[in-house]
């Protein structure tokens, strides 16, 4: 599903004063639900320490008064979610939910809102379901997969600076598998054609061309809304260049993803036609 990332606000040290919200989703009606979120309006509070029921009460109601930020979420029939680095049992999880509901029980409309608690195990499980996020997390904690990278600026200039995607209306791309006479595309039309193919799943696309014409930049633009609307989900993207000598190999990583029924979009740069055939 499409991610509503343009409607997400976050920033700052999670230990800093934040009014009870570290990350906020404020999506138009239906956009959050369509993107896989429980509600269109969500407030996330992130805690590095364990959160007992008494801690939850104090967090949501400092000095015995419900935080205005949480009250606003309830009035919008949204969701309030606490994410903790601690690991909890099933009994502790339900105790945490009860504590959250009790803390907000005096607010009108609380029964139409949603409260949830994410512990470290639940966060890890979600991360493992999204290969692009796995690559990003491992990179951030200093344990990257050799040669594999999450979505980022894969294509850089000779000076090491990011390149903007440059589009024009001239035909730049051709599809040799299309027997129709009209098989030439502008860059944006080509992006949309490749996106459509990749969304089907269980398929592959080989981008061929002379060195330096922008093949990697084109592949990066597949995941960029700024390059063309209706981009692919960047959290699914996992990138490598064969010159990085990736471990695991592209074939091994693909086998693992298939065995675990995990959805991902692998981009293998500078791969041979034989490797493409194998994949």
What are the language-model segments listed below?
Residues 1-175, 179, 208:
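Mixed-charge (Asp/Glu-Lys/Arg
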Residues 3, 224-236:
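Post-Walker A helix-loop "phosphate-sensing" segment adjacent to the P-loop in P-loop NTPases
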Residues 42, 75-85, 204-205, 234-240, ...:
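Hydrophobic beta-strand segments of well-ordered beta-sheets in folded domains
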Residues 49-54, 85-94, 211-214, 242-248, ...:
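Short acidic, S/G/P-rich loop/turn micro-motifs used as interaction or catalytic elements
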Residues 91-98, 128-129, 216-221, 250, ...:
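A short acidic (Asp/Glu
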Residues 185-199:
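Pre-Walker A adenine-sensing motif
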Residues 200-219:
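Walker A/P-loop nucleotide-binding motif
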Residues 236-247, 253-279:
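Conserved P-loop NTPase "ATPase switch" module shared by AAA+ and STAND
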